[in-house]
Amino acid sequence: MNSEKKHKKKSKMERGLTNRHVQVMAIAGTIGTGLFLGAGRSISLTGPSIVLVYMITGGFMYLMMRAIGEMLYQDPEQHTFINFITRYLGKGWGYFSVWSYWLSVVFIGMAEITAIAHYVQFWFPSWPSWLIQVVFLTILGLVNLIAVKIFGEVEFWFAMIKIVAILAMIATGIFMVLTGFETPYGSASLVNISKQFSLFPNGGMNFVMAFQMVFFAYLMIEFIGVTTSETKDPRKVLPKAVKEIPLRIIFFYGGALLAIMSIIPWRELSATDSPFVTVFELVGLKWAAALINFVVLTSAASALNSTLYSTGRHLYQIAHDSPNRFLKAIKADTLSRHNVPQNAIIASAVLIGFAAFINVLPGVSDAFALITASSSGVYIAIYILIMVAHLKYRKSKDFMVDGYLMPQYRWLNPLTMLFFIFVFGTLFLQESTVMGARGSAIWIVAFGIYSQWKFRK
């Protein structure tokens, strides 16, 4: 009992994440499984100009990270960047944001654990999906419960697998172009990109639709904004991690996409097959499909690991700021002897674990798919709120003149918000996303009104 009180009073997490951990996690945060599996689909939408879509979207995500980075630099003790919404926009919007963000990340975790089972069944099709999900969730849950430095180490190696796979793709592309490698599609050459180039080869609407697909490939880029309070020397580490985001986007996304389109003319690419598998098979790697399956499996495991970390910290924050009977009963506002929010992590993991059983219930699984799609739109609302909070921060007494400042914030901040609104609007233009967009709009309005009412003066 005394030990428990001690940990509750201490309320400080261990700074166990090093510069090495954070820098590599920042890279991993910009690279999702979509690059490995969905690049063919995104390229088929708008051809070589997809690189421009990635650069534009990545640029705005970088600006958002500069806003988050500026506020975290001023106050690196915060467990989450969501706290700045509470501080500068009020308890109502803070309540809306922290609950919405926590639930959205939980649904991302559910989607990732479902994907993990699918990737494992590539090798072991007879293994039951629910068992695979429970095993992975248990293992990664334990990783999060032991110590934050163990979490950081596991994330480091998960990220390295993705990085090596992309470097291998870029190196393969350079080799094939320089040697004029012959494939069933012709010679590998940069001409495959420039030949009959058109900015909108499939029409302007497909170019616009590409933005939403690319935007969601960048989800969780803000993850390093949750690790600051557990990072050693955050005022040195955080600016470096944020500053290098544009270079990572250009190199990893731009390099990989250009390599793919140099080897295979973009009109010949399959929208459903992984171009990574296709390219590696062209150079004689017979087990390319198994290799890329391993890469996306570790990528999904990395995302699940990060969601357990993030949901645990956010539920811990909720338990501190807006405790209810349930959160008090499970003592979600306490830290373990390893200085991690053990009970909050376990509660989040249990909720994510429901995915293992939801997916076998047809009616429920359809509703789950709609809710998951809706959470994507809610993410955009939170991104907009953090940009508004940044504007308020700049006018507050907390503003740190010699801090890590967002450049030209007076016009770049509103421009970033307009971009997020544009992406949200595109969700209503496509049949596959319109139901999720409506669901997210209903949540934003209904829960937003409730949150403001709950904390009305």
Residue ranges and their predicted role:
Residues M1-K6, N83-T86, E112-Q133, A165, ...:
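Helix-loop-helix connectors at the membrane interface of multi-pass transporters/channels
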Residues K8-M13, V51, P125-P128, M160-N293, ...:
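Helix-loop-helix junctions that connect adjacent transmembrane segments
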Residues E77, S100-T114, Y218, E222-T231, ...:
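Membrane-helix boundary/coupling elements in multi-pass transport proteins
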